[in-house]
């Protein structure tokens, strides 16, 4: 059985960033909140937007840090420490340059892959990397010098539709994760690709 107690969607705060590729993790958490019929509300104690949701009968905290991306760990650690949630009970959703739009993957552990949000979470959790990730493909601009502008830019409509489809499939796979296990959830999600 899955023991996820905290689901985090990484993002930059503010309306100007809401539709940028870097906020893909937040889109996933917003969709989970919508399905659970709960509202994400600002909570200064945890430096983010939070909600308590029942997903497939499981009591889960949802969190979108309202720090900037490179300070995400401050928010995640504050909530995890308060509720005594272990890294292995956390799922962090984030944008992934190394996967094309329309693809999403679950993963346990590993490095930060240059993602500043993951980097800060690992640092603030005492270098513990053993949390789950949901990697949401956003594609790569093809030149590492263009990455910053790319992740902070909006995707064209065709790419956005593919990302939305992958997020919808990730939500369905999350339900399998809670009802069954991570292996079955991975099997479902990893065989999906939006055309």
Curated annotation (Swiss-Prot):
Chain sites annotated for binding tRNA: 17, 68, 70, 116
List the catalysed reactions: an N-acyl-L-alpha-aminoacyl-tRNA + H2O = an N-acyl-L-amino acid + a tRNA + H(+)
**Domain of life of the native organism:** Bacteria
Site feature location: Discriminates between blocked and unblocked aminoacyl-tRNA: 12
Predominant location: cytoplasm
Q: What is its EC number?
A: 3.1.1.29
What are the subcellular locations of this protein?
A: Cytoplasm
Against SUPFAM superfamilies, the record matches this protein to: Peptidyl-tRNA hydrolase-like
Molecular function terms from GO: peptidyl-tRNA hydrolase activity; tRNA binding
A Pfam family found in this protein is Pept_tRNA_hydro
- Site annotation (Stabilizes the basic form of H active site to accept a proton) points to 95
RNA-binding as a keyword of this entry, yes or no, is yes
* Gene3D superfamilies for this protein: Peptidyl-tRNA hydrolase
Q: Which CDD domains match?
A: PTH (cd00462)
GO BP annotations, alphabetical order: protein quality control for misfolded or incompletely synthesized proteins; rescue of stalled ribosome
Function (record text): Hydrolyzes ribosome-free peptidyl-tRNAs (with 1 or more amino acids incorporated), which drop off the ribosome during protein synthesis, or as a result of ribosome stalling. Catalyzes the release of premature peptidyl moieties from peptidyl-tRNA molecules trapped in stalled 50S ribosomal subunits, and thus maintains levels of free tRNAs and 50S ribosomes.
User: Per the similarity annotation, which family is this?
Assistant: Belongs to the PTH family.
Assembly description: Monomer.
The protein here is known as: Peptidyl-tRNA hydrolase
Q: Which organism is it from?
A: Shewanella amazonensis (strain ATCC BAA-1098 / SB2B)
């Amino acid at each position: 059985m899955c023991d996820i107690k905290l689901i985090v969607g990484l993002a930059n705060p503010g309306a100007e960033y809401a539709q940028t590729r870097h906020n893909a993790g937040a889109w996933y958490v917003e969709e989970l909140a919508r399905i659970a019929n709960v509202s994400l509300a600002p909570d200064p104690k945890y430096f983010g937007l939070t909600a308590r949701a029942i997903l497939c009968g499981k009591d889960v905290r949802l969190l979108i840090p309202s720090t900037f991306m490179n300070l995400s760990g401050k928010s995640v650690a504050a909530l995890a420490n308060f509720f005594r949630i272990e890294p292995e009970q956390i799922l962090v959703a984030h944008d992934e340059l190394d996967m094309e739009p329309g693809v999403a993957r679950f993963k346990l552990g590993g490095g930060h892959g240059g993602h500043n949000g993951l980097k800060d979470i690992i640092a603030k959790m005492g270098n513990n990397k053993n949390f789950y990730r949901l990697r949401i493909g956003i594609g790569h601009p093809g030149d590492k010098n263009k990455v910053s502008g790319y992740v902070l830019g909006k995707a064209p409509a065709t790419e956005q539709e593919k990302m939305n489809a992958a997020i919808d499939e990730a939500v369905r796979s999350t339900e399998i994760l809670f009802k069954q296990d991570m292996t079955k959830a991975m099997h479902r999600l990893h065989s999906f690709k939006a055309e």
